[in-house]
Amino acid sequence: MERGGYGGGSGQGYNNFAVPPPNYQQMPNKTGNYNEPPPNYGKQGGGYDSGSGHRGSGGSGNGGGGGGSWNDRGGNSYGNGGASKDSYNKGHGGYSGGGGGGGGGGGGGSGGNDMITQEDTIFVSGMDPSTTEQDIETHFGAIGIIKKDKRTMKPKIWLYKNKETGASKGEATVTYDDTNAAQSAIEWFDGRDFNGNAIKVSLAQRQNNWNKGGGGGGGGGGRGGFGGRRGGGGGGGGGGGGGGRFDRGGGGGGGRYDRGGGGGGGGGGGNVQPRDGDWKCNSCNNTNFAWRNECNRCKTPKGDDEGSSGGGGGGGYGGGGGGGGYDRGNDRGSGGGGYHNRDRGGNSQGGGGGGGGGGGYSRFNDNNGGGRGGRGGGGGNRRDGGPMRNDGGMRSRPY
């Protein structure tokens, strides 16, 4: 038998060759089942086939575990992505012949919950809930000039309220004309009494939305098995890479017996959750608070399009791999699935493996986008499966 998936050489993962081989006198002799998945190039890969006919262990780190298989059914494969987001790729092998290997683990997303300190803005907490914006302006305006909003010409004071009840939380931000006034406000008002409450005053912070790169692309689907009455089903599609802040995608579709493997999934979501109602400017890609009616950067009025999510890949039927998802909000799609059986799979029932997921990208910095996922494996090529044609060849992108 051929052992299941294996990963890179360093780290915690290793190939365990201490498992005794199966007793070939106690199980049927299947010939031609060379179901060896392609190597995973991620670090700390692991996983092996114990010879029990079940799935190989999932690899740790960046590489996904390979699908171990013998007899009639291919094993499952679980691949964990690295960094801040886990990709979950599960590739089912085919029935009635050799099973397809699972897809490799997707790459992790870059970026994190980085916070930027606003040197000209203070955050005030612990106030009495009955405090109004006028009270705040009078009290904190005594130490320096409060900045005016250019559109409304009102002081830049934001009073935080409960979204359900509309009641004040006793917290607010105040933006001054210069940073020295903000520092002076902290020194003068922090810990002091305001309307009967001792308040806390510090520099305000906000999320860093401008340098978040997308996650890496998912691994390619496994190769379909040889032999049997029909060609083995194609491996499952690779998992999608991490997307930007508002991009979320589905996982790759698994293969099905004597059918084509599923397409690669859409990009995984970033780890920064937008607030309810936040919207993205169609002109400069700036993310604005829900209460703004125009972009605070380029002054473009608020539009209806706030970005869309990448769709998941569909499972293939009749030999063809399913199509990958796409992002409706822009021109960057996720990885497509395998083409029809004439291009990627067998001529008859041996379906092609799904393509890897497209790499995510940052809406705010296009240079930090993730890499494209791996290619899907070919279909089975014995008897009804038919020979493969143009397997693994490059094709023009549909976007």
Curated annotation (Swiss-Prot):
Q: Name one GO molecular function term.
A: mRNA binding
* Gene3D superfamilies xrefs: 3.30.70.330, Zinc finger, RanBP2-type
Q: Which residues form the RRM domain?
A: 120-206
Its localization reads:
Nucleus
Query: Where is the sequence biased in composition, kind Polar residues?
Result: 24-34
Question: What GO CC terms are in its UniProt record?
Answer: catalytic step 2 spliceosome; nucleoplasm; nucleus; transcription factor TFIID complex
Question: To which protein family does this belong?
Answer: Belongs to the RRM TET family.
Further remarks about this protein from its record: 'Cabeza' means 'head' in Spanish.
Give the protein's function: May participate in a function common to the expression of most genes transcribed by RNA polymerase II.
Please identify the protein, giving its name as recorded. Answer: RNA-binding protein cabeza
What is the source species?
A: Drosophila melanogaster
State which gene encodes it.
caz
